[in-house]
Amino acid sequence: MAAGAVFLALSAQLLQARLMKEESPVVSWRLEPEDGTALCFIF
């Protein structure tokens, strides 16, 4: 379970890096949760 969480966190960072260049700041902000809970909703 922990490995899956780490994988999702890394995927979120990669998506964030792409979206910050291509999409609106709002979308990028949604992929940058301070406590990591938003990952459940994104994936």
Curated annotation (Swiss-Prot):
Unknown. Candidate gene encoding tumor antigens. Its main location: secreted. The keyword Methyltransferase does not apply. This is B melanoma antigen 5. Not expressed in normal tissues except in testis. Expressed in melanoma, bladder and lung carcinomas. It is found in: Secreted. The keyword Signal applies. The ancestral BAGE gene was generated by juxtacentromeric reshuffling of the KMT2C/MLL3 gene. The BAGE family was expanded by juxtacentromeric movement and/or acrocentric exchanges. BAGE family is composed of expressed genes that map to the juxtacentromeric regions of chromosomes 13 and 21 and of unexpressed gene fragments that scattered in the juxtacentromeric regions of several chromosomes, including chromosomes 9, 13, 18 and 21. One of its GO terms (cellular component) is extracellular region. It comes from Homo sapiens (Human). Belongs to the BAGE family. Keywords: Secreted, Signal. The lineage of its organism: Eukaryota, Metazoa, Chordata, Craniata, Vertebrata. Pfam families: BAGE. Residues 1-17 form the signal peptide.
